[in-house]
């Protein structure tokens, strides 16, 4: 074989077990130039002739050698490409062989690891119990596909498995849920048994990242006696638990959801000092007000310990806890000016964290009343991103009212309300709590129609606190706010009067905005009356809704009825609604006067001038026979006037 085509063959085993020839190409020598030895210099002629003859022979040999080399290297490019293909096939075969071996090795190692894991689990205590219990629990957690009787049977079987071993099992991450399910679906006797087995370990249970959920379940589904057992073990450890990462949530849930006032005070009293942590008997009602009256000498110690607990809880990130809010409220209720200032400095940038609870909102309101102008600005700035949510909260909206009622810088508060409320005014006016902020701006918090007696007393209690920090007259302050918010509400009414009057709560904002907003309101009044246009006999007419007829009657009277004064208290601006409404009523006079709109017609008659009234009465008398057929009280009142 020629040099360029010399090959060696070996055999390669395929994945399927068959043999495949692998071709190995030998290395080729470098191509050399034709051989031509150096000529020697000869002085004789014979030497030259000999050399000439030799050179001719050499040329012939060289030419023949070149021809043979050309023949040998013919097709060398083709064999090189074949070699490349064969080498790539060889590498692919090797890679496939390696990957298949790696896969088989990984499967084997995975199986070995799984086997070892099972063996290790089997060696653990209660391994069989845990396995059986989890199998039963898996059936129980399928809420839709299991019947009550079947659940009861499985619970009984599960309870027999874990009984006497609850304390050991409940601290395990997988078995904690199993025991929780037994407490949730078990009988009273089964719950009492589990509770009794855990006696003496409830503090550790609350500190466990898995066990804490069982403690909460016992609070939720247990009897009052079971709750007393857990609380009894908590007594003396409350301060430590409230600062513990896991136990703090159990104490908070117990305090907020599952305890009465006396039990709450029994938990809180541990914040007053170590001497209150010693006594396990908490049957007596311990309250800080009574303590400070009976033992005034203990005030410095109690206030210092309360402050340490508050400061430590905030440092731990527990400022959102209801229990901490109660401690803060008790602290600020009995704090002197320096102590109150310390609490203000600690919490003024975290005000949004505690406005959502009853106690926390009262703390925030008192802090706003005690703060100076600079601190109020910081507090409002921290509250601004959450202003909408706070306004809609059952307690938070009172904080916003208190902040507006204390802050003299009405330019700042007006811009704040305009920026945050303007795009949400329609929704806010229909919200149960947020609308009260708008109504405060329009009529003040003294109005009993919108603010309960408790809330009015709470806001009134701030007057003495803000006397030193707020200089403006409350009426002046509110009128300045009204000048900013009033036009926004009137603009909204002009665009969406129908939507507002149709909504019971929003209609209150609409009426008071039309009565008391200090701006041009004619367009808004026309838009409101237009919503009542049409035949009152239609079922969807607004007059059939009680709040709509009441709102329209108030606008016709140009003010609200005062029970104390026994008369309508007129607004300063006369809207002249009665004169405008006649145009709408005349189209369907009998329907208005003999149906749900009868009292509105009576109010129109009372509001008109004498000349307008006489003219309207003439028109009504023409339909007296039709009106006599009506049984509506308003129609009978109207007939008396006729």
From Swiss-Prot:
Which residue windows does the record flag with biased composition (Basic and acidic residues)?
Answer: 1-19
Q: Which residues carry this modification: Phosphoserine?
A: 34, 36, 79, 81, 88
Assign the protein's first listed, main location to one coarse class.
nucleus
Which organism encodes this protein? Answer: Schizosaccharomyces pombe (strain 972 / ATCC 24843) (Fission yeast)
Q: Name one GO biological process term.
A: ribosomal large subunit biogenesis
Q: Which domain of life is it from?
A: Eukaryota
* A Gene Ontology molecular function term of the record: mRNA binding
A single cellular component GO annotation: nucleus
Q: Which UniProt keywords apply?
A: Nucleus, Phosphoprotein, Repeat, Repressor, RNA-binding, Translation regulation
Family indicated by similarity: Belongs to the PUF6 family.
Where, subcellularly, is it found?
Answer: Nucleus, Nucleolus
Point to the regions of Low complexity compositional bias.
43-55
**Region (Disordered) location:** 1-124
Q: Write down the PROSITE patterns for this protein, in alphabetical order.
A: PUM, PUM_HD
Keyword check for Repeat, yes or no: yes
- Biased region (Acidic residues) positions are 81-99
- Write out the function statement from the record: RNA-binding protein involved in post-transcriptional regulation.
This one is known as Pumilio homology domain family member 6
| Boundaries of every PUM-HD domain copy | 139-489
């Amino acid at each position: 074989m020629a040099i360029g085509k010399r090959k060696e063959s070996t055999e390669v085993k395929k994945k399927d077990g068959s043999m495949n020839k692998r071709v190995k190409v030998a290395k080729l020598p470098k191509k050399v130039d034709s051989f031509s030895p150096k000529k020697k210099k000869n002085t004789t002629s014979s030497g030259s002739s000999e050399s000439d003859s030799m050179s001719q022979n050499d040329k012939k040999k060289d030419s023949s050698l070149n021809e043979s080399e050309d023949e040998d290297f013919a097709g060398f490019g083709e064999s090189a490409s074949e070699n490349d293909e064969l080498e790539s096939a060889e590498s692919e075969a090797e890679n496939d062989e390696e990957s298949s071996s790696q896969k088989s090795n990984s499967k084997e190692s995975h199986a070995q690891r799984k086997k070892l894991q099972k063996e290790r689990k089997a060696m653990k205590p209660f391994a069989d119990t845990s396995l059986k219990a989890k199998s039963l629990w898996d059936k129980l957690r399928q809420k839709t596909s299991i019947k009550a009787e079947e659940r009861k049977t499985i619970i009984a079987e599960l309870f027999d498995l874990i009984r006497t071993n609850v304390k050991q099992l409940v601290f395990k991450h997988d078995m904690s849920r199993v025991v929780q399910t037994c407490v949730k679906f078990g009988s009273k006797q089964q719950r009492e048994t589990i509770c009794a087995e855990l006696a003496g370990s409830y503090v550790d249970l609350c500190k466990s990242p898995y066990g804490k959920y069982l403690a909460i379940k016992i609070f939720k589904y247990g009897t009052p006696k079971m709750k007393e057992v857990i609380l009894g073990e908590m007594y003396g450890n409350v301060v430590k638990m409230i600062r513990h990462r896991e136990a703090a949530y159990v104490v908070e849930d117990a305090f907020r959801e599952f305890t009465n006032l006396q039990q709450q005070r029994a938990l809180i009293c541990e914040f007053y000092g170590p001497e209150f942590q010693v006594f396990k008997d908490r049957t007596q009602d311990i309250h800080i007000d009574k303590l400070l009256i009976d033992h005034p000498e203990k005030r410095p110690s109690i206030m210092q310990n309360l402050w340490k607990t508050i400061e430590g809880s905030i440092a731990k990130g527990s400022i959102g806890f209801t229990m901490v809010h109660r401690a803060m409220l008790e602290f600020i209720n009995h704090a002197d000016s320096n102590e109150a200032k310390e609490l203000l400095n600690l919490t003024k940038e975290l005000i949004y964290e505690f406005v959502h609870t009853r106690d926390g909102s009262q703390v925030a309101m008192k802090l706003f009343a005690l703060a100076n102008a600079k601190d109020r600005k910081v507090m409002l700035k921290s509250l601004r991103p959450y202003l909408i949510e706070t306004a809609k909260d059952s307690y938070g909206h009172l904080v916003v009212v208190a902040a507006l009622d204390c802050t003299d810088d009405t330019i700042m508060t007006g811009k704040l309300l305009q920026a945050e409320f303007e795009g949400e005014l329609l929704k806010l006016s229909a919200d149960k709590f947020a609308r009260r902020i708008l109504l405060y701006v329009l009529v003040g918090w003294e109005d009993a129609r919108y603010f309960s007696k408790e809330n009015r007393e709470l806001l009134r209690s701030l007057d003495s606190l803000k006397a030193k920090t707020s200089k403006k007259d409350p009426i002046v302050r509110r009128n300045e706010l009204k000048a900013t918010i009033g036009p926004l509400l009137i603009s909204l009414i002009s665009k969406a009067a129908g939507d507002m009057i149709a909504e019971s709560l929003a209609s209150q904002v609409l009426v008071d905005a039309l009565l008391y907003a200090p701006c041009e309101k004619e367009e808004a009044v026309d838009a409101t009356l237009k919503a009542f246009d049409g035949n009152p006999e239609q079922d969807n007419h607004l007059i059939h809704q009680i709040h709509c007829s009441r709102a329209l009657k108030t606008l016709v009277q140009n003010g609200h009825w005062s029970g104390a004064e026994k008369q309508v208290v007129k607004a300063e601006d006369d809207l002249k609604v009665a004169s405008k409404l006649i145009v709408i009523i005349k189209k369907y006079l009998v329907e208005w006067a003999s149906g749900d709109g009868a009292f509105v017609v009576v109010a129109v008659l009372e509001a008109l001038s004498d000349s307008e009234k006489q003219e309207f009465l003439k028109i009504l008398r023409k339909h007296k026979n039709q009106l006599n057929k009506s049984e509506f009280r308003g129609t009978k009142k109207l007939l008396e006037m006729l």
